[in-house]
Design a protein with these regions (language model features):
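Substrate-binding cleft of secreted/luminal carbohydrate-active enzymes
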Residues: 1-10, 16-20, 24-114, 161-168
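Catalytic domains of carbohydrate-active enzymes that cleave complex glycans
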Residues: 54-58, 95-207
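Ampipathic, surface-exposed secondary-structure segments
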Residues: 4-26, 121-142
């Protein structure tokens, strides 16, 4: 849990963990201490965590969650939808990886359709779409049928996709470098989910 009354300090405390190369297959879920933290400050810290390469976040403690904070979240994100079918990272890492990546795809599709910030050439655009669909297929297959072979396929597809991502984003990064960095962080989170799942699921069972 990170205890900070301002977002810059919160970021300084969180980043050594979010950028650590020593966590291995550990899922990182930072916590925000709500006591004495203004509602707008809480929202600011929540937004920061959404943009970092973490698996989620926790709010501590429930009795400090107030009506004003609830109103801010509703006004910026809408009313909370029924999320009972959303996968849980700790217990459903493969499904979570596919689910999170599907959300990324929707953002990219919106970008290409609603703006001119497309990949830097027609051939690159076609290659990007082929590669991101290939990765989605690999993650979906892994979520449906967890196995060592499907995990290898998903990891290979993800590594290949990440290696070309900066090249594909050479135009968008000029207009909105922060957003591109957020996307890179979300790909890192998916990579972390696969590492966690490999240790938790694949290495503890025998698959054909």
């Amino acid at each position: 849990m990170t205890d900070a009354l301002d977002t810059p300090r919160f970021q300084r405390l969180a980043e050594p963990w979010t950028h650590s190369t020593k966590l291995g297959s550990t899922l990182l879920v930072p916590g925000i201490r709500l006591l004495s933290l203004p509602s707008l400050g809480t929202f600011d810290q929540l937004q920061l965590l959404r943009d970092l390469p973490v698996s989620g976040y926790a709010l501590f403690a429930a009795e400090n969650f107030n009506e004003k904070l609830d109103e801010i979240l509703i006004s910026t994100q809408g009313k909370v939808q029924n999320t009972k079918h959303d996968p849980i990272p700790q217990s459903q890492p493969f499904q979570t990886a596919a689910f999170r990546y599907a959300g990324l795809q929707k953002e990219w599709q919106f970008l290409w359709e609603k703006s001119e910030q497309a990949p830097n050439a027609v051939t690159t655009s076609a290659n990007f779409k082929n590669q991101y669909q290939e990765l989605q297929n690999a993650l979906n297959q892994l979520a449906i049928l967890p196995s060592a072979s499907n995990l290898i396929s998903a990891k290979v597809s993800l590594t290949r996709f990440q290696s070309q991502f900066k090249s594909w984003m050479s135009v968008p990064v000029q207009e909105n470098p922060y957003q591109v960095k957020v996307w890179e962080n979300r790909l890192i989170t998916i990579e972390s989910l696969l590492r966690y799942a490999e240790r938790r699921v694949i290495n503890k069972a025998t698959f054909n």
